[in-house]
UniProtKB/Swiss-Prot annotation:
Amino-acid biosynthesis listed as a keyword: no
Source organism phylogeny: Bacteria, Bacillati, Bacillota, Bacilli, Bacillales
Protein name: Phosphoglycerate kinase
InterPro entries noted in UniProt: Phosphoglycerate_kinase, Phosphoglycerate_kinase_CS, Phosphoglycerate_kinase_N, Phosphoglycerate_kinase_sf
Subunit structure: Monomer.
Length: 394
């Protein structure tokens, strides 16, 4: 997947409509985690230094097509100004005469932030009129919001019908690592899939089984696979309606020569609580009434040896109830194995990101994806609308 990026186009003097993902956690008007804003800075700087007029657009929260005062992007503009060391003017809307006039007055290297695009109902409906009004502001569309690339909205896909579209640096990195791992991985290629439910990851597992050498399963979903193999799982979470599917997936792995790794031991608890009584047991010895809440130390050891010997590893989803320290050992163990792997290590969004941060090894990962749902759909092999509209590199 080879898409044009801002490195491949002339930016000097050009008006650039850049879609970013500034949907950051905020409490009482204070940003509590600015990761997404910081992630967009290299792209913004690159365009500023190249002499572009940078028009930033983002959604924030779910205002459902209404103006919601608490969902204005004013705190984001202030924070971005301090990160860039340059004043970023925040406009009161994202379309209309005032916006057009403000863009008209821009000089090369200027940056403005449009108001929350989801204040307009047309954004999520991919309304052509709204998309046209965005396109009218600029000469070029840059998509740097991988986190919303799975949505065909006016500011992520619709706008590209009317002006040329290329990737920002963050989007370029996502396509390079996520796309590269899935289309042309260095082998052995290992995927680690965790999380509570099989149903959330069916399409991911099905797609990965056509690509990987090893597939590691953990988290609550492992219980369903264990029960499908005939193990008693006590009071553990299980999707009884997915037992046949689990058997089918295991059969597919066998047919394709994929090594499927399951827990050999688990940490069980007498109830679902941080202070529950817990013990480590083999998977054929889960006591009646107890529940598996994490993978055990022998399992971590086995997973570790496969991970460190891999040339490409993609991870999505925790190995246990890692929000509770008592059941975080398996997830932390896998995070440390990823850090010890000298190959390409990719964290496919969601809870796994929090896990590598908790383990203190985030810096050692090759790539941490910024997309939750987008990463998941990418791993499912779906074409993402926000990526599909970008110009191909010939």
């Amino acid at each position: 997947m080879n898409k044009k990026s801002i490195r491949d186009v002339e930016l000097a003097g050009k008006r650039v409509f850049c879609r970013v993902d500034f949907n950051v956690p905020m409490q009482d008007g204070v940003i509590t985690d600015d990761t997404r804003i910081r992630a967009a800075v290299p792209t913004i700087r690159f365009m500023m230094e190249a002499g572009a007029k940078v028009i930033l657009a983002s959604h924030f929260g779910r205002p459902k097509g209404q103006v919601v005062e608490e969902m204005r992007l004013t705190p984001v503009a202030a924070h971005l100004s301090s990160l860039l060391g340059k004043d970023v003017r925040k406009l009161e809307d994202c379309q209309g005469a005032d916006v057009e006039a403000a863009v008209e007055r821009m000089e090369s290297g200027d940056v403005i932030l449009l108001e929350n695009v989801r204040f307009h109902a047309g954004e999520e409906k991919n309304d052509p009129e709204l998309a046209k009004s965005f396109a009218a502001l600029a000469d070029l569309f840059v998509n740097d919001a991988f986190g919303t690339a799975h949505r065909a909205h006016a500011s992520t896909a619709g706008i590209a019908e009317y002006i040329p579209a290329v990737a920002g640096l963050l989007m370029e990195k996502e396509i390079r690592f996520m796309g590269g791992a899935l289309s042309n991985p260095e082998r052995p290629f290992t995927a680690i899939v965790g999380g509570a439910k099989v149903k959330d990851k069916i399409a991911v597992i099905e797609n990965l089984l056509t690509k990987v050498d090893h597939l590691i399963i953990g988290g609550g979903m492992a219980n369903t696979f264990l029960k499908a193999q005939g193990y008693g799982i006590g009071a553990s979470l299980c999707e009884d309606d997915k037992l046949d599917l689990a058997r089918t997936l295991m059969e597919q792995a066998k047919e394709r020569g994929v090594q499927l790794l399951m827990p050999v031991d688990v940490v069980v608890a007498d109830r679902f609580a941080a202070d529950a009584e817990k013990q480590v047991v083999a998977i054929d010895a889960i006591p009646e009434g107890w529940m598996a809440l994490d993978i055990g130390p022998k399992t971590v050891e086995q997973y570790h040896s496969v991970i460190v010997d891999s040339k490409t590893v993609v991870w999505n989803g925790p190995m246990g109830v890692f929000e509770m320290d008592a059941f975080a050992g398996g997830t932390i163990g896998v995070a440390k194995a990823m850090a010890a792997c000298s190959g390409t290590t990719i964290i496919g969004g969601g809870d796994s990101v929090a896990a590598v941060e908790k383990a203190g090894v985030a810096e050692q990962m090759t790539h941490i994806s910024t997309g939750g749902g987008a990463s998941l759909e990418f791993m499912e092999g779906k074409e993402l609308p926000g990526v599909a509209v970008l110009a191909d590199n010939q």
